[in-house]
Design a protein with these regions (language model features):
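Hydrophobic ligand-binding cavity/cleft-lining segments
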Residues: 1-42
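Hydrophobic-ligand binding "helix-grip"
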Residues: 55-98, 104-109, 134-135
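Short, intrinsically disordered, mixed-charge
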Residues: 20-30, 69, 123, 127, ...
C-alpha cells in the first residue's frame, strides 16, 4: 500500500462553499485544468459513479464510496490489479477550514499505478487545492 496526504488551513472558504464545488462534478473542468471533462449522472452520493477524462488520458470511472455532506467524501478508481482511493476531508478549526486530501493506492500492481498516475496527482495537490479554494470562494 502507498499513501500520501496534503492539508491546508484557510479562512478564504467555508465547508459549504468547498462542498458545493466538489458536488458539482459536471463543472470540475472549469476549475481543474487537468480535466477535459467529468460527468456524473444522478446526485453526488454514495454508490454513484462518474466518468472523468484527464487531459491526454483515457476515460476513468470513479465510484463514490462514502459521502458525508460538507464533511468528507471518498472515491475509488479501479485499475488493472490495483485501486486508487481519493479521500477529501473538510474540518472546521479555529484557524479556518482545514482541507485534507489523501491518495492511497492498494493492490498487486500498486507500484505501477503510483508511478503512472498517483505520484503526479500528489505532486500537483498544493496547486490544485489553491485552485479549488479560489474557485469555491466565488460560490
Amino acid at each position: 500500500m502507498w499513501s500520501r496526504s496534503y492539508s491546508i488551513t484557510t479562512k478564504a472558504v467555508t465547508k459549504e462553499q468547498i462542498w458545493k464545488l466538489f458536488a458539482d462534478v459536471n463543472n470540475w473542468n472549469t476549475w481543474d485544468k487537468g480535466i477535459e471533462y467529468a460527468v456524473l449522472k444522478g446526485s453526488f452520493e454514495k454508490g454513484n459513479h462518474f466518468t472523468l477524462r484527464p487531459k491526454g488520458g483515457p476515460n476513468v470511472k470513479v465510484e463514490l464510496l462514502e459521502v458525508i455532506e460538507n464533511t468528507r467524501f471518498l472515491d475509488v478508481t479501479k485499475f488493472l490489479f490495483a485501486k486508487m482511493y481519493d479521500e477529501h476531508i473538510f474540518e472546521e478549526t479555529e484557524d479556518g477550514l482545514k482541507i485534507t486530501n489523501i491518495i492511497t493506492v492498494k493492490g498487486l500492481l500498486s507500484f505501477l499505478w503510483v508511478k503512472l498516475v498517483a505520484k503526479k496527482i500528489v505532486d500537483s495537490l498544493p496547486l490544485d487545492v489553491q485552485e479549488q479554494i479560489k474557485a469555491a470562494s466565488k460560490l
